[in-house]
Amino acid sequence: MNTTFQQFAEAHSLRNGYKLAQTLSPVPPADDPQRLMAVWRSTNSHSVKGDIKHFIKSSTAHKRKLDHDETTGWVEVYTSYWKAVSEILAGESGKSSWTKVYEAWKELTSVLIRGYNSHGFEAWTIPSLYMVGKYLRLFAIKSDEERRAKAFDTGPGASLISDDFDPETDKQLQLRDCEGHLKRIFSLCLNDRAPLEESRKWGIYFVINLLFKTYFKLNSASLSRTILKTLAVYNDKGDMPPLEMFPKSQRVTFKFYEGVLLFLEENYIKAESHLNEAWQLCHKDAYPQSERILTYLIPCRLLTSHVLPTKALLENYPRLQDLFLPLATCIKTGNLQAFDQALQRGEAEFVKRRIYLTLERGRDIALRNLLRKVFIAGGFDEAKEADAAPVRRTRIPVAEFQAAISMGSGHLVDPDEVECMLANMIYKDLMKGYIARERGIVVLSKKGAFPGTGL
């Protein structure tokens, strides 16, 4: 454990919160894979608290000394950390469970929060909260997965488990419990009254992002609105550092989830703005993050400005190529049947990402492009004067649109259904004109018959 507390003392001497947080990691560093085992072997359950107090005092003796109250707080934290490490190592050897790991890590989280409330932990140490909060969520997910696996176990004792555990009701029990503890960290940061330069408010967006991830995992994305409303109150009072002053990685994640939340609320214009900001901030080599942003930004742009993704844009994203390029090709060519087939092929992934219904609206754009082709194929009206500029034919028989839609759909479409489709196009401002039913024609505008397409 000497290595851990040497790093602890150095972090305190430098006031380096991220270095301090590494001493609370449940994952050993790559250059010291036996770190957790060394921590566990350095003491035992009977003398752990006294040993840790000795380690902290001796390691900080020649550096920045801690006062008695703060020392007591960190002794409690590292005692809880040692117990959590014990469960992690026991789990690796099959002698513990993820549920016990989660409970031990939850205790560490509570003790660390108490350190800020009761033992005067300074704001520069907040990356420690990032570390425990991040892994609290991951251990909660692991625990829930373990419980579900046991619930469906058909081996001896399975019936005993199922008697008191409803897998549908309790399938995310630990993650819901975790959400409550993350909100405690959120409140701890939000309600700090210290001056901004030494405030825990600098940890707020990291914690908000953890809560966003938790709510989306719980399929309760709407709960994110409560967090955003609370944040807005503090921003309006000028009691919060500007978002631009936080690390770029935190801003990218925050803007992504804010954009997705607006996307799910069908506020596509605002969603596009937030997602585009996340896209612009995202590092060019952060492909997984960029891919997640594009998964929602592409459908947004399809609806707001009818812009289709290009092969060049998706060059580094094979999964997105498979999902979006077939749809983009069908929309561009107006091939309704192929569009329906491409949407059906990707249905499972589209539904999982909650973009199916949005992409389904892309069929209107495909239909618009098909109708536009009919308009172009109609050619020009005969010029009344020799030197007059050519004017496209604007009176199109409904029968011509019916033939095109039937061919594009792969089946005969009833004339009344065609008229309904045309009326819908006009209503959505994808086509300008009106239907003259008594004459069986569509009269299109001489200028801008298909807005945004150059015709």
Curated annotation (Swiss-Prot):
Which residue pairs form cystines in this protein?
none
Q: Which residues form the PCI domain?
A: 252-449
The cross-references to Gene3D superfamilies, in alphabetical order and at most eight, read: Winged helix-like DNA-binding domain superfamily/Winged helix DNA-binding domain
Q: Name one GO molecular function term.
A: RNA binding
Cite the InterPro entries for this sequence.
Csn12-like, PCI_dom, WH-like_DNA-bd_sf
Q: Which domain of life is it from?
A: Eukaryota
To which protein family does this belong? Answer: Belongs to the CSN12 family.
Recorded protein name is Protein CSN12 homolog
Q: What organism is recorded for this protein?
A: Gibberella zeae (strain ATCC MYA-4620 / CBS 123657 / FGSC 9075 / NRRL 31084 / PH-1)
Recall the taxonomic lineage recorded for the source organism.
Answer: Eukaryota, Fungi, Dikarya, Ascomycota, Pezizomycotina
The protein's gene is named CSN12
